């Protein structure tokens, strides 16, 4: 089996017509739009995206542009409620959790003001081609190395081949339909009607243009250019009739009023399909091939389609080749949603077919957006971090304003949820009374510095890192004994027995203390590297040294809140208090062995009560299991993502059946962590290699802090090859089976150790 080629002999609609193929769930007739769309192939370059799907006869591409969001012109600003902070703090000090939570939610999480609510990411429309006659569906496939989809159908005259990709060089959508005999059909561009959106069309024999205007918001347009050796004629607005063609080549673009709509829309690559694909695939495949995971597998499975292999895994059978494909698919999805983008990947990457998508397809700062980029540095996709960096830095103005108006603090505040417009306004009653968004996302920015050593980048993010520290300077409350308390505080998104609100407000939750400790550390290290702000560094260091301890309960578990509370949901999907175990390295056997063991007990407790019941949560569990060296636990939860939380095309699912991309992307981070984990200043080789993968395998091109590139192979769990290409850090330490090797080399030098 080619692990970067996803091959199927059934169309996407098969999974909405056959109950057995969708886990026995009832399907709508004639087919379920939502379910069918999720069985398609996602293609994209970050700015543009499309889901390629359809039935036995029709090709359908659901189109997206990263800036097509509602709400652009809403006047959103946080309420001026800082004067109420003391009241909420006093209630928490007195132990009146319920009233403190009620008032905190009212004052600091948006209350009931829907005007500040974020608005949803929107689909741009659909492009379809319906041939006049199709005898049979033959196959469809997605090449993960190039991002090219290919579909074959049998017609009375011969074989009709359709291809599509989104060009990461030319920055347009490309489609081509070819046949060895003339074909005819209808090319259509349309969008589902919506009451607040006005659509107009302009159609010629060579072009289709659709313009849309969303009331009180953004304008957008989709432009299609069609070239054929047959006859093309306008059949009606938005539709072209194609007759007697052996080739139909399409180039498409999308634009919004976020930029210069006319200029953006008129852009074309200036190349034919083959030339465009050649330049695109060169860049795309270079990035996909920077890292290579190889696992031993059963060659007898190579003849099966991907959906057949997924079904085998659901039946409890082993399939290393499918694990390898799932790993590569996650890398493909991050690349396709980030490489040319200005915005980071949202909850669904850049793919959405719904006018009102779940959670608005927004950006969640309490795990999801961070998880999307956990793998970016180790898989050597540093370019993909740029859209995330741009997005975060755009919050500075609104984040400073909200910090002042909500809490009377300097510095920057980020809400739990946000949309494309980077407004730091809390909008959801309950969950949004949380100050941890800015410190958590600062970890992603800091990691890019650790892996790249780019001093200009560090100077660029330094104002944000210090603004986070500055917020803590003002927000923390000092006890008489000198301890700095985080007040109010919460542990996303958990609550306790008897509380009528979705999240508990307390003093110094475990996660908030961990985030504060790390964020102050980033500011300190950055200032020292840049040789600035020595006075502020002294203050930040003092605060860090006087934060509350990481508390352990009487049963040996790490306490989630500042004291032992009865959890309303012991198996809660969030693992917020385990941030210090992963993605942070606060808790390791070397640094804090007691908290490390307590965190493991907390993880086991949560799982024993049904935790990890969403795709992203299960991915986090897999990361945690890999970090603690639990090889079989890692394998169990990694494969559960395929078995229990994936469509037949391996897209991650949130119950009941909602696509969320974070599980796909988090799974890659887990796979990396199982094979090479970096903490305590060392790269730990094969720390959680499961027995199912132990026979033979290799990982080549994984990136480490310091910019080092590591490649190694193993047989029967023992290293057989090991080499390092030295990065800017010049020194790297490797650990395996209790032994540590420290290598000193010149930048760019490749040293073969085994």
Please tell me what each predicted stretch does.
Residues 35, 319, 361-362, 430-434, ...:
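Alpha-helix N-cap/helix-initiation motif
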Residues 44, 175, 328, 462-463, ...:
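Short alpha-helical basic/polar micro-motif
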Residues 406-407, 434-447, 482-490:
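Core alpha/beta catalytic barrel or barrel-like domain that forms the active/cofactor pocket
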Residues 447-448, 452, 456-457, 468-478, ...:
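Non-catalytic carbohydrate-binding regions of carbohydrate-active enzymes
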Residues 41, 324-325, 363-368, 380, ...:
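Aromatic- and histidine-enriched alpha-helix N-cap/loop-to-helix transition segments
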Residues 333-335, 371-382, 440-454, 471, ...:
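Well-ordered alpha-helical scaffold segments within catalytic/enzyme domains
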Residues 467, 471-526:
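Acidic/histidine-rich catalytic neighborhood
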Residues 1-429, 447-449, 466, 484, ...:
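Aromatic-residue-lined binding/catalytic grooves and analogous aromatic/hydrophobic interfacial grooves
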């Amino acid at each position: 089996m080619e692990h970067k080629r996803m091959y199927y002999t059934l169309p996407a609609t098969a999974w909405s017509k056959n109950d057995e193929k969708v886990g026995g769930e009832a399907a709508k007739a004639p087919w379920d739009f939502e379910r069918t769309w999720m069985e398609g192939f996602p293609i994209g370059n970050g700015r543009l995206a499309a889901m390629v799907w359809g039935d036995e006869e029709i090709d359908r591409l659901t189109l997206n542009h990263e800036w097509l969001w509602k709400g652009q012109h809403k006047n959103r600003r946080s309420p001026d409620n800082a004067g109420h902070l003391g009241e909420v703090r006093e209630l928490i000090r007195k132990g009146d959790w319920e009233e403190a939570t009620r008032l905190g939610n009212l004052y600091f999480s948006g209350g009931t003001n829907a005007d500040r609510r974020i608005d949803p990411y929107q689909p741009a429309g659909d492009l379809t081609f319906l041939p006049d006659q199709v005898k049979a569906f033959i196959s469809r496939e997605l090449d993960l190395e190039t991002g090219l989809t290919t579909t074959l159908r049998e017609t009375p005259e011969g074989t009709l081949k359709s291809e599509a990709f989104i060009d990461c060089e030319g920055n347009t959508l490309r489609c081509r339909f070819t046949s060895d005999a003339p074909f005819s059909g209808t090319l259509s561009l349309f969008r589902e009607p919506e009451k607040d959106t006005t659509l107009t069309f302009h159609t010629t024999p060579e072009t289709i243009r659709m313009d849309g205007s969303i009331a009180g918001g953004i304008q957008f347009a989709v432009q299609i250019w069609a070239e054929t050796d047959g006859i093309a004629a306008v059949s009606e607005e938005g539709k072209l009739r194609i007759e007697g063609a052996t080739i139909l080549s399409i180039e498409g673009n999308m634009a919004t009023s976020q930029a210069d709509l006319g200029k953006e829309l008129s852009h074309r690559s200036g190349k034919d399909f083959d030339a465009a694909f050649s330049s695109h695939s060169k860049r795309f495949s270079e990035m996909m091939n920077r890292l290579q995971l190889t696992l031993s597998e059963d060659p007898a499975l190579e003849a099966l389609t991907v959906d057949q292999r997924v079904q085998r895994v659901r039946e409890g059978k082993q399939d290393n080749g499918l694990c390898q494909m799932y790993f590569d698919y996650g890398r493909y999805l991050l690349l396709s949603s980030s490489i040319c983008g200005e915005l980071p990947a949202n909850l669904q990457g850049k793919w959405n077919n719904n006018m009102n998508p779940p959670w608005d397809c927004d950006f969640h700062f309490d795990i999801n957006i961070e998880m999307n980029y956990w793998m970016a540095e180790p898989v050597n996709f540093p370019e993909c971090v740029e859209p995330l960096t741009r997005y975060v830095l755009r919050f500075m103005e609104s984040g400073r304003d909200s910090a002042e108006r909500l809490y009377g603090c300097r510095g920057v505040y980020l809400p739990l949820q946000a949309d494309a417009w980077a407004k730091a306004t809390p909008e959801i009653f309950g969950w949004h009374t949380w100050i941890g968004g800015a410190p958590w996302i600062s970890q992603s920015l800091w990691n890019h510095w650790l892996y790249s050593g780019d001093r200009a980048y560090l100077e660029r993010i330094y104002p944000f890192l210090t603004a986070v520290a500055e917020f803590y300077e003002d927000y923390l409350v000092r006890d008489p004994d000198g301890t700095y308390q985080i007040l109010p505080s919460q542990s996303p998104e958990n609550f306790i027995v008897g509380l009528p609100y979705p999240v508990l407000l307390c003093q110094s939750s475990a996660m908030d203390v961990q985030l504060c400790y790390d964020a102050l550390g980033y500011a300190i290290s950055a200032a020292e590297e840049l040789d600035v702000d020595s006075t502020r560094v002294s203050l930040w260091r003092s605060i860090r040294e006087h934060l509350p301890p990481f508390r352990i309960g009487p049963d040996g578990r790490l306490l989630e809140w500042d004291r032992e509370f009865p959890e309303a949901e012991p198996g809660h999907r969030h693992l917020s208090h385990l941030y210090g175990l992963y993605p942070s390295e606060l808790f390791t056997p070397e640094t804090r062995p007691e908290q490390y063991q307590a965190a493991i007990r907390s993880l086991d407790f949560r799982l024993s009560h049904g935790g990890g019941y969403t795709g992203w949560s299960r991915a986090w569990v897999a990361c945690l299991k890999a970090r603690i060296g639990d090889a079989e636990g890692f394998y169990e939860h990694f494969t559960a993502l395929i078995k229990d939380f994936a469509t037949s095309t391996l897209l991650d699912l949130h119950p009941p059946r909602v696509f969320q991309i974070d599980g796909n992307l988090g799974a890659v981070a887990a796979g990396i962590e199982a094979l090479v984990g970096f903490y305590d200043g060392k790269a730990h080789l094969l720390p959680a290699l499961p027995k199912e993968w132990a026979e033979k395998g290799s990982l080549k091109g994984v990136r480490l802090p310091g910019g080092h590139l590591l490649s190694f192979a193993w047989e029967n769990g023992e290293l057989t090859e090991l080499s390092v290409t030295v990065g800017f850090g010049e020194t790297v330490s490797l650990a395996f089976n209790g032994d540590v090797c420290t290598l000193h080399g010149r930048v760019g030098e490749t040293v073969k150790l085994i």
